[in-house]
Amino acid sequence: MNAVGIDVSKGKSMVAIMRPFGEIVSPPFEIKHTTSDINSLVELINSVEGESRIVMEHTGRYYEVLAHQLSKANLFVSAINPKLIKDFDNDSLRKVKSDKADAVKIARYTIDKWQNLKQYNVIDELRNQLKTMNRQFGFYMKHKTAMKNNLIGIIDQTYPSVNTYFDSPARSNGSQKWVDFASTYWHVDCVRKMSKNAFIDHYKNWCKRKKYNFSKSKAEEIYEKAKELVPVLPKDNITKLIIKQAVDQLNSVSTTIESLRTLMNETASKLPEYPVVMAMKGVGTSLGPQLMAEIGDVSRFTHKGAITAFAGVDPGVNESGSYEQKSVSTSKRGSSVLRKTLFQVMDVLIKTHPQDDPVYQFIDKKRAQGKPYYVYMTAGANKFLRIYYGRVKEYLSSLPES
């Protein structure tokens, strides 16, 4: 029994090899995340007599290089939640935090949890690409929100509340009507310096050129509102440049998001569970690929409770002696990205209210009972995941083995 504890960091790791009763096989030593160093580590582990198991924390993405390469070398690798390592064996008043001490602690954890360690599954390239794209998608969505708020903050000084004039959804290229309008009519004087009929004609030609629907009543409403607005910034080239730059930045990130959304759907369609996931209510070509990206291969979960714990939507427990708390908040120890996606699915269900969907029926029942928002949304996410697990696993088991 050889326990290999690896404290992973960016570009390098600290390794310690131990046996039961504190026997040191190899004191902590550092390796680089290079082919030569990893191969040397594999040779060292294989040279040690007895079964070896390797444990590391799944910290960010740093651990993936080692986990992937060591698994390919047919070694037993287990990636553990850092929280479990941190809470393990805290029986000392001294606070020691170093890479060497952490590597030894992970090795001791390996010995203590030997029978319960779960082997790391190498994520196939397609799922890995999909998950990476989804994380990039989330990154750009945050930037889009920031860019949008930035543009609204600037445009409110030249054309107040112009962002509320249109509620058209974003196009497939990411463009939005109010953003295009603000780019052309970037100052309130761009509208009210014209006569009413001249603006209506100009707006009509703009709609035709941009391929938007034209409404004369809407044009008249815009013109009448413009006469009452009070701008702060002057109508000059400097102000125009500031607004144009903000519009260009927002359009750029919007285009990137929509191209990623399309690419994610194309990639997800190559996965075997795609038709089952897409058939579920509340899931479309955007949220479906996001779900598959974050959940990954369902077969790695042993039961329904495992997948809800992975998402952090499993109900908590608080009992002590004769005390038993009836309402306990969820663990929230799982993937926050997956929880966000699940809440978006629940939001779609609430807005579309499909009466024949069991998840919506469950949410509606909880709402009727007067449950708070987060309670019924989390309960719905838990039920959705359980159904997801059952349907996908049943479908995958029915497929012929390749």
Regions found by a protein language model. Give the residues of each.
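A detector of single, family-specific signature residues
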Residues: 1-402
